[in-house]
């Protein structure tokens, strides 16, 4: 692991609505909009069009410009996605409310070739698994590294078709989804991903 993530002393409760209370499966990405490449939009559009789902987007931890948001809406519409299936969330002012937004999401979709870092740590902390793309260098392997440390290699896609297949498969598999929520949070907190003390100690010794 190249990094360890510190988190608030008091975490929001994990409260993912039951399927019967949600008409649509919810994908989501809170990554910086600048990371949402055309290839990423292409695959996300295929996923939403071919499933009973919607996708929540939020520009990291600050509001995106109107121009950037409208550009994203146009790119999804150009690929046949209904505008009401792409939901933009406003930035919350405090970390507790920000993290609570992950309760809206069933599966986080990572961007590529540049994946999320903070957002991926936040997602697993809130019990939401992250589907990421296998990378080819340090900058593109952050999501891959996080999932490997969680023994979640099945959430690392080899290519765009594999990414699509895994996203649809997760939506349709209730048995897999039952393994997450608080179980994923506990697993993450006991992993090297959030062990800042030992990470700092090891890094200092190397210096």
What are these regions (language model features)?
Residues 27-29, 56-57, 88, 108-110, ...:
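Structured core elements
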Residues 2-94:
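Conserved catalytic-core segment of nucleotide-activated headgroup transferases in glycan assembly
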Residues 105:
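An anion/phosphate-binding loop that grips the pyrophosphate of nucleotide cofactors and donors
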Residues 102, 111-196:
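Catalytic binding pocket for nucleotide-activated donors in carbohydrate/polymer assembly enzymes
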Residues 94-98, 119:
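Short acidic active-site motifs
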Residues 39-40, 68, 101, 143, ...:
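Residues at alpha-helix caps and immediate loop-helix transition turns in enzyme cores, especially N-
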Residues 31-33, 49, 53, 57-63, ...:
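C-terminal amphipathic helix plus adjacent low-complexity
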């Amino acid at each position: 692991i190249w990094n360890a993530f510190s988190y608030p002393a008091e975490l929001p409760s994990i409260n993912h609505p039951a399927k019967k209370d949600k008409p649509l499966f919810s994908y989501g990405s809170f990554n910086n909009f600048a990371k949402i490449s055309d290839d990423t939009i292409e695959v996300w559009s295929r996923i939403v069009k071919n499933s009973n789902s919607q996708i929540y987007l939020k520009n990291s931890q600050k509001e995106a410009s109107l121009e950037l948001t409208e550009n994203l809406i146009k790119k999804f519409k150009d690929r046949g996605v209904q505008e009401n299936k792409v939901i933009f969330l406003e930035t919350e002012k405090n970390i507790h409310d920000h993290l609570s937004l992950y309760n809206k999401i069933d599966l986080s979709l990572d961007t590529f070739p540049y994946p999320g870092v903070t957002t991926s740590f936040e997602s697993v902390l809130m019990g939401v698994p992250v589907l990421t793309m296998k990378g080819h260098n340090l900058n593109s392997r952050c999501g891959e590294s996080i999932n490997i440390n969680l023994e979640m290699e099945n959430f690392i896609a080899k290519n765009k078709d594999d990414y699509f297949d895994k996203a649809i498969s997760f939506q349709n598999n209730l048995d897999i989804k039952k393994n997450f929520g608080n179980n994923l949070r506990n697993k993450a907190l006991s992993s090297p991903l959030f062990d800042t003390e030992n990470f700092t100690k090891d890094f200092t010794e190397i210096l």
